[in-house]
Amino acid sequence: MQLNLKNQSFCLLLSTLLGILCLSIWTLQVLQTSYAAASVSENAGIKKVVILNFDDGRKTQFTQAKPILDNYGYKATFYVVCQYPDNKKGYMNWTELETLHKEGYDIGSHTNNHADLSHASKNSLEYQIGKSKECLEQHGINATSFAYPFDRGWDNKTVVNVVSKYYDLARTASSPVTFLHCDGWVHQSNQTDCRTYTKNGNLNYANRYSIRGWSHDQSRQINSYSDDQLLRRFIQVVNTQNKYNENGTINAIPIVIYHSAGDKDLVDYNTSPILFDEEMKYLHDNNFQVLTMKNLAFDKETNDLFLK
């Protein structure tokens, strides 16, 4: 069968169009592959780290959160109210805390009675801050860091003077990240290092006794987040560091603060084990390095924080 001229022209046109279509598809695939490779390359220099904290010493931190941490091979810092173990329902006992310590978890002080330190007397400060360290030492725990209850006292010179007598570092809240050089607080301070005091003897806004973290449960309480919303916010917070950490250099670290972990009597200040597992899985699947406050230290020569 012979094709007439019109049919030959049509076939030629069809072949040309098919060739262009195939070339376009191939080009699109190449561009997509190149874009994906560029994205991986762009993020390859970002080393992601996160520090996990648990405040108050609730029993569910041991019974619900610890097995999940163990499953992923992660450790965390537990800030303990020293008069609660064996004395207050719903909180860990000393056997559980000593188990955490023996298994490599970090234990810090959260005062003796979860006291508001902002208006405490000097005697009360010594009891809440110094005696809580002594209390932990009696159970074989050398606490090197401290956490302020209610996020209060970190900006009080009298309080900080007592904290600095007993601890290397102290943590408060109110920020998604803490800056290792204390130079990221452009709206609060023009400081370029982490000295505790200014030349005039006043407290610097950021220093090793006001290390900032993000309160996971308070964020839920303030914003009435569902679990899905809180997971999305968690992902945003732990990735806040990306714009500060480039080429493998760590300048900013997110510190995530948890409280309850599945307590049935707490609704809006609580993290369910399901949500906690999802968050730990996200860290695992995205190659985060999970650390404790024990990994954070202060260089007295440069007046900066650094990771050990």
Regions found by a protein language model. Give the residues of each.
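N-terminal Sec-pathway targeting helices
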Residues: Q2-T16
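Sec-dependent signal peptide cleavage junction
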Residues: S24-S41
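Metal-dependent polysaccharide deacetylase catalytic core of the NodB/CE4 family, i.e.
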Residues: K48-V50, D70-D193, N204-D217, I250-D263, ...
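Catalytic grooves of carbohydrate-active enzymes
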Residues: W214-L291
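Charged, glycine/proline-rich intrinsically disordered loops and linkers
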Residues: L180-R212, Q221-Y225, L231-N239, K243-N245
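Aromatic/hydrophobic pocket-lining residues that form the small-molecule binding cavity
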Residues: F62, N93, L125, I129, ...
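Hydrophobic membrane-insertion alpha-helices, especially the h-region
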Residues: S15-W26
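Boundary/entry segment of secreted carbohydrate-active catalytic domains
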Residues: S39-T63, Y258-S260
